[in-house]
Every structure is written in structure tokens, then in C-alpha cells.
Amino acid sequence: MNPELLPIIQLGNPTLRQKAAWVENIHDATIQQLIDDLIATVAKANGVGIASPQVAQSYRLFIVASRPNPRYPHAPEMEPTAMINPKIVGHSTEIVEGWEGCLSVPGIRGLVPRHQAIEVEYTDRYGNLQKQTLTDFVARIFQHEFDHLDGVLFIDRVESNLNTITEEEYQELVTKNTK
């Protein structure tokens, strides 16, 4: 079956605030189709990650798809990767702030503190357990998407309203910093 573009639900939809369900059968055709659909949806939306709850499918599953784009011109290039039933098993003490946005919270950016490095475990789409150390931008994507699985949005992590800007203001910052 061909991948389908799924509608991305927006802030206010109760699914975004729920704890997502464990994926019991990774090889289930519905889960495999959802993975393909999420990969197509995040690419079309020009995002760097998307979690299953963002398309109203409350499973512990997300895609990390880092690549340079107008919002993140310095993002590292990586293959879109399905991360199923993920866990953070360790993290650095170093916390770094970075601007985040979300396909489910359009028009707003927030300065969010995250661990600079994390040790993670997840099952890939083929049923293999993966263990990795992620750093910098990819670690930030993982932590952002992981939060979605517990009903947490990036705006919940912003420490002050002064650390919130519009997408337009953010684009001006990006443009200024890439010249």
C-alpha cells in the first residue's frame, strides 16, 4: 500500500495530551503502514520529526528525520528513522537551550532546555532493539518527540513567556544567523 499523507492534529486536540500506548506487535500491517505514512507526512510538512499522537494515533512511536530545511538550515542529514517504544536510559548533565517549534503548534517557537546528549533504546521497524547515543540537534528532536508520547508539548518546557516568539520572528533570526 502506498504511503498516505495524514492530517496533523493541532494544539487543543485531547490526543496530544494523552500518554500513548505501547506498540505490542511491531510487524502488524497497520503499524508498518503508519510508519510509512508518518515518514511521508513529516517530509511533506518539511519537519524533522513527527510522533504518532500528532496524527491522532496514540502509539509509542515516532520518526526522527533530521535534514536541513528553511527552519533548520544546519540540521544534520539522516535517513528518516522509526523509533518504536523508545526509552531514554541516560543523559548528560549539560543542558542546552534551543529554539523549537512543532507541526501541532503552528506559528510559535519556544526556547527549550534539553539534555545535550542522551542514551536511548528503541525498537526499529524490523523488530531489532537499537541502542544509541544521540547528541545536539538529533538529541533535541528525540526528546521533543519522546515528550509527545507522554502528552507533553514543547510549550510546556519553555521556562518563561519571554522565551516564546512567532514563527516570523524565528525566521528572521535564522536568516540573520545564516548570512
UniProtKB/Swiss-Prot annotation:
Its EC number(s): 3.5.1.88
Q: In the UniProt record, does the keyword Metal-binding occur?
A: yes
Keyword vocabulary terms for this entry: Hydrolase, Iron, Metal-binding, Protein biosynthesis
Task: Specify the enzyme's EC class, one word.
Answer: hydrolase
* Membrane-spanning residues: none
* Cofactor binding note: Binds 1 Fe(2+) ion.
Please name the Gene3D superfamilies in this protein's record: Peptide deformylase
A GO BP entry is: co-translational protein modification
Reactions mediated catalytically: N-terminal N-formyl-L-methionyl-[peptide] + H2O = N-terminal L-methionyl-[peptide] + formate
**A single GO molecular function, which one?**
peptide deformylase activity
> Which residues catalyse the reaction?
145
Chain sites annotated for binding Fe cation:
102, 144, 148
Q: Which cofactor does it need?
A: Fe(2+)
* Pfam families cross-referenced by the UniProt entry: Pep_deformylase
Function in brief? Removes the formyl group from the N-terminal Met of newly synthesized proteins. Requires at least a dipeptide for an efficient rate of reaction. N-terminal L-methionine is a prerequisite for activity but the enzyme has broad specificity at other positions.
Q: Which family does it belong to?
A: Belongs to the polypeptide deformylase family.
Please name the PANTHER family in this protein's record.
PEPTIDE DEFORMYLASE
Write down what this protein is called.
Answer: Peptide deformylase 2
What organism is recorded for this protein? Nostoc sp. (strain PCC 7120 / SAG 25.82 / UTEX 2576)
